[in-house]
A protein has these predicted regions:
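Bacterial N-terminal signal peptides
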Residues: 11-22
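N-terminal secretory signal peptides that target proteins for export/translocation
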Residues: 1-7
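Short sequence/structural segments immediately N-terminal
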Residues: 25-232
Length: 232
């Protein structure tokens, strides 16, 4: 009798566990179904098609340093998909007559909006020293990070004093003309960069200055003009 009652008790307990666990299991399956589809082989999947030098140049940059845990190619990171999003559907088989699903891309001629492109970048770079992108003049004018920066080259031209000005002059045509004047700062000669005076990420609203004001910025180089003067 005791054995029969015990067996019935276990049966009731088992049914209760199944009833409780069923919604949790269904919920877990639903969550799993909603997870983005990442490629199984990571960057190796991408390079089956994207094997040109312009793409493979990423391995000469800080974005692809396996020893750096914060790098997209660091241990346990998502490699290409850290920036370009889940590529499982994009890399999968495409039926005849269908277009390959797009993934986030960083250029002016893509379906990815400028705001979405920048959102991907600031997920990692928002903590950089002196970074105040949101609400800056460049942000307000829908300038993309990729509009200035080149991520797949060993030396990003906008980060080099000798080549930075040409990147800036693509948009700032008036400043290009001013740089030709005989009394201009030696920007064209590569002796100083635009960022010597300006902060493109928007620290100071006034003309994107590197200093707290026009004078403070100038005094970094022209300390002899700081004063005080005899007849002030």
């Amino acid at each position: 009798m005791l054995t029969t009652m015990t067996a019935r008790g276990f049966a009731v307990l088992a049914m209760a566990v199944l009833v409780i666990a069923a919604p949790a299991t269904a919920h877990a399956q639903a969550d799993e179904a909603e997870l983005p589809d990442y490629s199984r082989k990571g960057a190796d999947t991408c390079f089956q098609c994207h094997d040109d030098q312009a793409t493979l140049g990423i391995f000469r940059t800080r974005h692809a340093v396996p020893q750096d845990p914060d790098s997209p190619f660091g241990h346990g990171q998502l490699q290409c998909e850290a920036c370009h999003g889940p590529g499982g559907d994009h890399a999968g088989r495409v039926r005849r007559g269908q277009e390959r699903p797009a993934i986030p891309a960083f250029a002016s001629n893509t379906t990815t909006s400028i705001s979405d492109q920048n959102a991907y970048c600031v997920e990692c770079h928002d903590a950089d020293t002196g970074f105040a992108w949101h609400g800056s003049a460049h942000d307000d004018n829908t300038v993309s990070c990729a509009g200035c920066h080149s991520m797949h080259v060993e030396r990003d031209p906008v980060l080099s004093t000798s080549t930075q000005a040409e990147v800036c002059f693509d948009c700032h045509q008036q400043q290009r003309t001013q740089s030709m004047k005989p009394y201009a700062h030696p920007v064209r000669q590569g002796k100083m960069a635009c960022t010597s005076c300006h902060s493109p990420h928007g620290d100071t609203p006034e003309r994107l200055l590197a200093g707290n004001s026009v004078n403070a910025t100038c005094y970094d180089c022209h300390a002899e003009l700081r004063g005080p003067y005899l007849w002030e």
